[in-house]
Amino acid sequence: MHSPSVSSASTISAYSDDKQFTMRIKYGLYLSLFLGLSFTASAKSKGPIRVACIGNSITYGYGLADREHEAYPVLLQQKLGARYQVENFGKSGATLLARGHRPYFQQEEYKKALAFRPDIAVIHLGVNDTDPRNWPNYQDEFIPDYHHLIDTLRAVNPQVRILIARTTPIGVEHPRFESGTRDWQLQIQQAIEQVAKSADVELIDFHSPLYPHPHYFPDAVHPIAAGMHFLAETAYQAISGDFGGLQLPVIYSDGMVLQRQRPLTIRGKANAGELVTLSFHGWSGNTKTNRLGEWAITLPAQSAGGPYSLEVSTPQSKRKIKLSNVYVGEVWLCSGQSNMAFMLSQSTDKEHRPIQPDSMLRIYNMQPAQET
């Protein structure tokens, strides 16, 4: 959503409230100073690629023993290297909402982020908007306010690349978790996803990588240093396109069985934009990964048979994964709770249970992330 002028009538009319009107005019006048200087700045030689990490206390590094070395923007700088200049513009308690209890728009960090004129902006805001002073009263303004933040960044650098993040988890130990925070955060996540589409910016996920690790959140909100590595890696992968090269999920392995008589979609990861080729039993197909390094190729329905080989490769990086002894047949799923993981060897009458060997029977035992 590009704004031709930060003080345009469209910006003014979007906020009829007197307080909002005053705030927007103030931001517009402030931004016009940057726009006036942009021609001078563009004439200078290009230095490192400037990356602005915009956010709240999680970006700032609140609660870390050594935020100067452990906050995710610092780790991101280490990953990206000398070609990039990463700056931390996190503000503790900041809200995305302009009428929230501590609007990011009113903070010095916001002004500094604009003065930095980033080439890339990573935005992680929305956690503090779950406060009952904010979301219940101003939720309808969240998407317009997010658009305004994006517009102001584009105003100081029209070529800026913007990545907005789904918010980090809020733990069940949070005192307001069941009284509104849980549901409001879900609504905020959905709003962020909508902004990514309507503003044509990139969506990254700070939520999913940390969700399986509640022990990284001693106060239910702020991740410890180990959690910061997940945030830095997520941002690094999105910026660089480096997702670690060609990969297949653990469920694909030597000796596996593919379901017969049905088209099957094989999924995996590789670096962003890479060409991926898949070959199986005389058939081959290819595709390109998306910006998140994800790819999917659908095999046509196959008749029962085997053994075959399945090969996946990325010609650009010269990587190859070859799976052998692959059959096409019947696949049965045995799902359930922890009692489904009970081993026959643990049974008191195990010696009385006859076991018939079957060379054509393949069993894949998915290991739990955590024992329950």
Model-predicted segments: where are they?
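Structural beta-strand segments of beta-rich domains
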Residues: R262-I266
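Short, solvent-exposed loop/linker segments at the N-terminal edge
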Residues: M256-R260
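Alpha-helical cap/lid subdomain in secreted, periplasmic
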Residues: K44-K46, Q78, Y104-D242
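Surface-exposed, proline-enriched loop/turn segments that connect beta strands in immunoglobulin-like
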Residues: I251-S253
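Conserved SGNH/GDSL esterase-like catalytic core that processes O-acyl groups on lipids
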Residues: K46-C53, I58-H147, D183, G329-L333, ...
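Bacterial Sec-dependent N-terminal signal peptides
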Residues: M1-S3, D18-S45
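Extended acidic/polar, glycine-enriched regions
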Residues: R267-S335, N339-M343
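Proline/serine/threonine-rich low-complexity linkers at boundaries of modular beta-sandwich domains
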Residues: F243-L248
